[in-house]
Amino acid sequence: MAIKNNVMIVRQRLLTKLVSLWNEGQLVEKIDRVPIEFSPRNSQVRGRCCIHKERAVWKYKSLPLLGYDMTDEADELTPLSDYAKGALDRKKIKDNIMCVIDEACSSCVRTNYDITNLCRGCVARACEHACPKGAIEFDPETSQGKINHKICISCGKCFAACPYHAIVYIPVPCEEACPVGAISKDEYGVEHIDESKCIYCGKCMNACPFGAIFEISQLLAGIRLFLYSVP
């Protein structure tokens, strides 16, 4: 069964728009207006800081649908129309199939564990003794614990030790979904796909709640091939 959520609706809407523009022979002429058309002035922004960020995300989500990934961007000022021209003239497709849209990636959490307000500030402090890095700290007034995320290595020993289950595991959806461990964060907290490990199963794409992982589409090339091959 196909996954149905807002991320997939957005992906389908954008893909439909680009194909419609191509079918009308206006892809190059009108593609630069797509981010503004999809996020007009005073529109409500969902999950982003501002409308300008949302428009940037629309732009970068268009790139893989045109057959590019983020490494193809040499100049941030290059308009979508230039990429559209290149897509229409492309003779060779890219080797990789999946890519991460860094502008859309929310970076999720750096460490997978956190202490909730269920912490009773107990005397035993089993979490503190279980931590191999000394990442558990305590509020001097409430005695409630907190995790120093700069030190935490996400080993989960505190999670297992807490008798109140006050420590929660926070997953990173794309990393959790990947069956071969091909996704990890860089020094800026943005996810990257290790092409030497990736098996292109697409589970990370379906799992990301921000729609930051895209398949590099060859749809336009496929349509052209089909049209030219039909007698």
Language-model regions, residue ranges each:
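Iron-sulfur-cluster electron-transfer modules
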Residues: H165, I170-P171, E175-E176, V180-P231
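Ferredoxin-type iron-sulfur electron-transfer modules and their immediate structural context
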Residues: M1-A161, H165-A177, G181
